[in-house]
């Protein structure tokens, strides 16, 4: 449980007996940085501190000048020594780190943006030993660039002593599906199926296929893949497989197709409790509460008892509508039926109350949790930190963050992402960078940075025109196998446009287009308008030409978003 020193003082203003009883909360609007975070955080290198403060460094006469000297990293052939030479000299680090195989491969993959056939030819000069772990790492780094990923995949399979496994095939299938190259995706699945002895096509393979089809709005294709997978690939169409399909359809906003599958297969594939919970969640998500209730009644008729997952779907939907009266009624109904809310339920309620600016009630949720003997988890902490930060209580948020391990709860990537966003929201740029550095020291993969980790940091760099720090962060992303996706390009293009860095925005736009990611509509218009304002006619024509040529080649580009 959380210590009284940390949590109890937060709810001492309220101490509600019912979680929705209205009280006032006295907020702490201090801007003081948490001494706990400051004391335990690792020291930042001077070259990052200089970028944040715009002070001259000991090894550079003008950081601001360097900060303007921006060259977009190609995300692979970045010359590390060029960018980090000052750090190496100042720290006396004269020993060069050997170039890792992953970096050698990435150097080749980013030499030019060409077809996957050309990538295969280029890699013929690459002298690395191919292993399964190397293949998986490369596919993670290029999960948004199917040409490079697929070219490397083909080349790797031709190397002496190496044969692709089911894991690497599935990873490549997922990349192709993510990039919506479905024809090539199916070719690869059929290639996997030729190896009858190994049985490479599994439910994991087909689940990735169905999920990617559903995500692209190809709901009928996803259903067809399920119906054909036993006959064509020997993958059993059982309850688990049906649930995988229905879950994909519901998550991608098609409860109608999921319900249709359920009705069609009801007599041939026996549903289980998860089947009903998927449908109930889908109906609640679509605000079809009568249908959700009817499904819960059918669940009971088929001798399955509604559980905490069932009720939490209703709670979440009512929370999103801001109908806390019905939320309270649902919580009471749960208890009457012998089903206590769990930490997921309480986290949803607390987060929604905080979002509705009912902060006293939100913090009061913890008291109710204690009554039920419910122990907070990492997601609960993340929500609590977010609420405290948004209400000006950043010092409390930082203390709660630091106290997590004392309470036996490990910080994960979601908690770090929330804390980084909170630090930046309160102009604690240096603390945010410390947190990013601390993530590397956490054990396990649960704290590996993801796109959401970097997004607010990149946004800060654009807003404050920290061009060199922006480059360092992009490099850091690649080193952590975080693929630059279309959303990141949009963030960069729009952020740089708003900061007057139009030339840099053009560079990112060009790179996105070369990789098949075309930010259309509002993003493109913003860039063109900014170029027009600055009388950059030549650059404007180039951007318009890029978009038009790409549109002609692929008028239905699956990666085009606004």
UniProtKB/Swiss-Prot annotation:
Q: Which UniProt keywords apply?
A: Mitochondrion, Repeat, Transit peptide
Q: Which GO terms describe its cellular component?
A: mitochondrion
Source organism per UniProt: Arabidopsis thaliana
The record's annotation in Pfam families points to: PPR, PPR_1, PPR_2, PPR_3
Which segment is the transit peptide? 1-31
Q: Where is it localised? A: Mitochondrion
PPR repeats span 165-199, 202-232, 238-268, 272-306, 307-341, 342-376, 377-411, 412-446, 450-484, 485-519
Report the family membership: Belongs to the PPR family. P subfamily.
Q: Which InterPro entries match?
A: Pentatricopeptide_rpt (IPR002885), TPR-like_helical_dom_sf (IPR011990)
What this protein is called in its record is Pentatricopeptide repeat-containing protein At3g22670, mitochondrial
Q: Which domain of life is it from?
A: Eukaryota
Mark the transmembrane ranges: none
């Amino acid at each position: 449980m959380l210590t009284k020193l940390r949590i109890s003082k937060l709810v001492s203003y309220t101490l509600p007996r019912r979680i929705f009883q209205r009280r006032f909360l006295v907020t702490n609007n201090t801007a003081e940085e948490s001494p706990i975070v400051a004391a335990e955080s690792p020291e930042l290198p001077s070259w990052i501190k200089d970028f944040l403060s715009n002070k001259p460094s000991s090894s550079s006469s003008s950081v601001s000048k360097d900060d303007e000297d921006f060259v977009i990293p190609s995300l692979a052939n970045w010359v590390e020594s060029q960018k980090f030479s000052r750090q190496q000299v100042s720290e006396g680090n004269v020993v060069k780190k050997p170039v890792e195989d992953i970096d050698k491969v990435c150097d080749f993959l980013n030499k030019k943006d060409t077809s996957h056939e050309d990538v295969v030819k280029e890699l013929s000069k690459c002298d690395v030993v191919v292993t399964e772990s190397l293949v998986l790492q490369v596919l993670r780094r290029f999960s948004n660039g199917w040409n490079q990923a697929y070219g490397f995949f083909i080349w790797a399979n031709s190397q002496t002593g190496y044969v692709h496994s089911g894991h690497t095939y599935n990873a490549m299938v997922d990349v192709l599906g993510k990039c919506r190259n479905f024809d090539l995706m199916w070719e690869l699945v059929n290639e996997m199926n030729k190896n009858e002895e190994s049985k490479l096509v599994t439910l994991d393979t087909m689940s990735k296929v169905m999920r990617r089809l559903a995500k692209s709005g190809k709901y009928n294709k996803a259903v067809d893949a399920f119906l054909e997978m036993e006959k064509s690939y020997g993958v059993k169409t059982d309850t688990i497989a049906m649930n995988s399909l229905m879950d994909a359809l519901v998550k991608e906003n098609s409860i109608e197709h999921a319900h249709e599958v359920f009705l069609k297969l009801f007599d041939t594939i026996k549903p289980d409790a998860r089947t009903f919970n998927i449908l109930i969640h889908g109906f609640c998500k679509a605000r079809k509460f009568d249908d959700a209730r009817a499904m819960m009644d059918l669940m009971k008729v088929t001798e399955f008892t509604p559980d905490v997952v069932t009720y939490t779907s209703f709670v979440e939907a009512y929370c999103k509508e801001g109908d806390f009266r019905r939320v309270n009624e649902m919580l009471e109904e749960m208890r009457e039926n012998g089903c206590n809310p769990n930490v997921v339920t309480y986290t949803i309620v607390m987060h929604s109350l905080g979002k509705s600016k009912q902060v006293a009630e939100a913090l009061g949720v913890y008291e109710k949790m204690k009554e039920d003997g419910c122990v907070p988890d990492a997601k609960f902490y993340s929500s609590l930190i977010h609420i405290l930060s948004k209400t000006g209580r950043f010092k409390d948020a930082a203390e709660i963050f630091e106290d997590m391990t004392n309470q036996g709860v490990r910080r994960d990537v979601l908690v770090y992402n929330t804390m980084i966003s909170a630090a930046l929201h309160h102009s604690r740029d240096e603390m945010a960078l410390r947190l990013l550095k601390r993530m590397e020291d956490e054990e396990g993969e649960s704290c590996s940075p993801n796109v959401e980790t970097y997004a607010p940091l990149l946004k800060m760099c654009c807003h404050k025109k920290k061009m060199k720090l922006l480059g360092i962060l992009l490099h850091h992303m690649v080193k952590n196998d975080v693929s630059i996706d279309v959303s990141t390009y949009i963030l960069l293009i729009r952020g740089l446009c708003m900061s007057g860095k139009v030339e840099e925005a053009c560079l990112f736009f060009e790179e996105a287009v070369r990789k098949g990611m075309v930010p259309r509509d509002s993003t493109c218009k913003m860039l063109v308008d900014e170029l027009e304002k600055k009388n950059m006619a030549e650059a404007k024509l180039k951007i318009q030409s890029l978009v038009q040529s790409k549109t002609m080649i692929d008028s239905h580009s699956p990666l085009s978003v606004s």
